[in-house]
């Protein structure tokens, strides 16, 4: 029981350490609201040196030598995009895709579905929808998708049955070889459990 308690204590300790590490990695939301950092423009170790200076120009020997450079740190430049960030799409003044209003152009633009007679002007257009479930006189086996699904399903079913029969034959053959022979005498003989009362 002691190893289980030790393991639980270790898990709690690791969870606490991970939570404290996660709290130190959080960026202050005020910095994001002020616009200091944009996507990918977070400060880097290379940003410590000023513009026009290389990190090799300074001769530093330890961790305390960078304290003098903190006053000269310049933040990243804010780049304003040239394209406005709104979603407004300007209207084109030229002749783009316009909806025809003349009846002759509308008739030329009509799409007539197959298996349906051309639409007469006196009939209701909404009732002329061709659906596969409403087509009369068609056999379900005429469709290639249904036929392909039946063939593949039949092949998979036959293979499953063959493998099941082979598994049963293998187990029966294994029993015939004697690998499951229970008639052997055990090596260890159980001692008699006679109780004596005094």
Swiss-Prot record:
Glycan-linked positions: 39, 61, 63, 95
Ranges annotated as spanning the membrane: 146-170
Chief site of localization: membrane
Entry GO terms, CC: cell surface; extracellular region; membrane
Keywords: Glycoprotein, Heparan sulfate, Membrane, Proteoglycan, Secreted, Signal, Transmembrane, Transmembrane helix
Sequence ranges on the Extracellular membrane side: 19-145
Transmembrane recorded as keyword: yes
Cytoplasmic side: 171-198
Leader sequence residues: 1-18
PTM characteristics: Shedding is enhanced by a number of factors such as heparanase, thrombin or EGF. Also by stress and wound healing. PMA-mediated shedding is inhibited by TIMP3.
Subcellular locations according to the entry: Membrane; Secreted
Gene Ontology biological process terms, A to Z: cell migration
Lipid bilayer topology: Single-pass type I membrane protein
Function: Cell surface proteoglycan which regulates exosome biogenesis in concert with SDCBP and PDCD6IP.
Family of the protein in this entry: Belongs to the syndecan proteoglycan family.
Quaternary organization: Homodimer. Interacts with CDCP1 and SDCBP. Interacts (via its cytoplasmic domain) with GIPC (via its PDZ domain). Interacts (via its cytoplasmic domain) with NUDT16L1. Interacts with DNM2; this interaction is markedly enhanced at focal ahesion site upon induction of focal adhesions and stress-fiber formation.
Name of this protein: Syndecan-4
The species this protein was found in: Pongo abelii (Sumatran orangutan)
